[in-house]
Amino acid sequence: MSATKSAGPTTLANHLDKEVKTDVLGAIDSDKLTEATQGDHKAINEEYKIWKKNSPYLYNVVIATVMDHPTLTVEWLPDLFDDITPGSMSARLMFGSHSSGLDKDYIHVASVELPTHLRPETIGLLSQQEGGTDMKQHHDAHGRHKRIAIVQSIYEDGEVNVARYNPLASKQIAAAHVTGDIHIFDRNNIMNSKEEAKPIYNLKHHTKEGWGLNWNINHADQLVSGAIDSTVAFWKIPEAASDGSCKDVTPHTVYHHDAAVNDVKFSYKMDFLIGSASDDCTLRLWDTRKPGNKAACTIKESRGINSLDFNPHSEFLVATGSADETVKVWDMRKMDTPISQLYSHCDEVTKVQWCPHQPSVLASGGHDRAILVWDIARLHDDLSSDENDEGPPELLFHHGGHSSRISDFDWHPTLPWVIASAAEDNVIQVWRMAESISNDEAVPADDVDMED
């Protein structure tokens, strides 16, 4: 079911409009929103108004905030806390700041207040706080309650293109800079400070900036990076210095493309396999067990490939997002042609990511301001003529809440269907599509919980 299918009683829409007045999302400061979108075309603003009006029918939760500067990176941390507010829990979201030299730049960790009903009963709370409770309620300068609030800031001397936490040592955060250097921090040992944070590792190789950065989920000491300098660097991180001093690290192996490298990933199932996507129109697979730097497999597309992601549930599936506006799904056992090509974006696709909870579901985002959620298991579903007009059968949901290009998005690792997304207009959103869409079953209108 696509987003345009959702419907609900007119009385509910009227009620919500009265309750929240002009701001369905509540957390967005209306003045900042006007400033952030004033340069946009009238058509984009009209699309946003339509989306906002229909939001009560499309989502269980939508939370949004406007930052002082845009972020190019967003990622959920695994931490979950009981919240001091009854019926709420706190998640942690990491993002950066990209001030273009106008201000200091940071890696931020924010508390995100979410309703507890989003958590499956089988998932317990993970906490680094005694008692497992986030004891603070967060407010803005005007005393208004904030659903998304920064709780830690790591000051960096330079803009951060991408930041990723180590899934086997979540206190470690790797950050790729505009200089090409990669810093690794221990976030537990860094307090909020106006002084530049001291990394525990400095990874030096890339001569230009990059956006590709990924930890090996099977080996805590392995990291891969990619940059505009056309190289892919495979790193093996040594033991940290006992005195806390910074260690310089050089790559274990360097692989090469013929143009800028846009994305890099380790396979979830085959821990020796690295994939890289490049402006040279290729997806290349690298076997870290083999000496030398020759690609084990190369896939050629018609235009540059911006993103890739290995399926965490199937060792053979890999998805790509490309400048040709398509998402493709490949079977690594037969890479001569994709097993699925997904068409609905109307501009470059810059990010693809498989859902950690559903083997056949993935999301994509790009320059068309949209995040699309797909279910490739629906590829051969028969649709009615009305349904067919709304898009291909694989298109499960269209998130249209952003008014600028998508910078990054991330599925929450333990909260099913919860996504955080960021766009170039400084807006960060946290959302969960309605259960009537994700589960293909009706949910009473009273169960729709619009968070502000």
From Swiss-Prot:
Q: Which biological process, per GO, is one annotated for this protein?
A: regulation of DNA-templated transcription
- A single MF term (Gene Ontology): histone binding
Q: Does the keyword Nucleus apply?
A: yes
Per UniProt, subcellular location reads as:
Cytoplasm; Nucleus
The WD repeat ranges on this chain: 155-195, 205-245, 256-296, 300-340, 344-384, 401-441
Task: List, alphabetically, the GO terms of the cellular component aspect.
Answer: cytoplasm; nucleus; Rpd3L complex; Rpd3L-Expanded complex
Q: Which UniProt keywords apply?
A: Chromatin regulator, Cytoplasm, Nucleus, Repeat, WD repeat
Query: What InterPro entries does the entry give?
Result: G-protein_beta_WD-40_rep (IPR020472), Histone-bd_RBBP4-like_N (IPR022052), WD40/YVTN_repeat-like_dom_sf (IPR015943), WD40_repeat_CS (IPR019775), WD40_repeat_dom_sf (IPR036322), WD40_rpt (IPR001680), WD_repeat_RBAP46/RBAP48/MSI1 (IPR050459)
Pfam family of this protein, just one?
Answer: CAF1C_H4-bd
The family database entries (PROSITE patterns) matched by this protein are listed as:
WD_REPEATS_1 (PS00678), WD_REPEATS_2 (PS50082), WD_REPEATS_REGION (PS50294)
> What is known about what this protein does?
Regulatory subunit of the histone acetylase B (HAT-B) complex. The complex acetylates 'Lys-12' of histone H4 which is required for telomeric silencing.
The entry's family comment says: Belongs to the WD repeat RBAP46/RBAP48/MSI1 family.
> How would you summarize the oligomeric state and partners of this protein?
Component of the HAT-B complex composed of at least HAT1 and HAT2. The HAT-B complex binds to histone H4 tail.
Protein's recorded name: Histone acetyltransferase type B subunit 2
